[in-house]
Amino acid sequence: MVACSSDDPETDTGNGNGNGGNAEAPYVWGTEGAIKTCDHLLFNDDKTENAKGTVIGNGDQEFIFKGTQTLSKGTYLMKGWIYVGTGSVLTIEPGTVIKGDKDTQAALIVEPGGKLIAEGTKDAPIVFTSEQPKGQRKPGDWGGLIICGNAKNNQGVLNQQIEGGPRTKHGGNDDADNSGVLRYVRV
């Protein structure tokens, strides 16, 4: 594995999901304004970068995911605002659990033109939930799953700002827009 930094142009030879598969996208950092961009957003609990980590984002800043990435079946903790950028695809394998960090109000935001492919099964659904223990979870524990497409919205307004979001807008005139698949997913 190589470092995910702008001064290290090498690429990771794995696909980032821990199974040693072929590289789907390079492992490099970039910036878009004040937001970090990276093909892999996985970290260790101590916020060190790790393409095989179990923490998505580091909670210190927003991230925008670019390229094509697959989250292998497992349990992940999402910290901060994680964006699936325009032209990017995030696939989540069946049986995966993604917990949202309460302190950072973690959210997964699929921007217009980005895709989330989350196809669970009856026996192995994909679950998005609060990191809080069972029985202590409450509305507002985390930011949720936000999918912003280019189709008409119920406000009749093009490019409507998402609630609480500093950058992402939704709505347009493309009613054939496709932001991915949610099947056997519990939020």
Language-model segment annotations:
Residues 1-3:
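Sec-dependent bacterial lipoprotein signal peptides
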Residues 5-187:
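Beta-strand/loop edge motif enriched in small/polar residues
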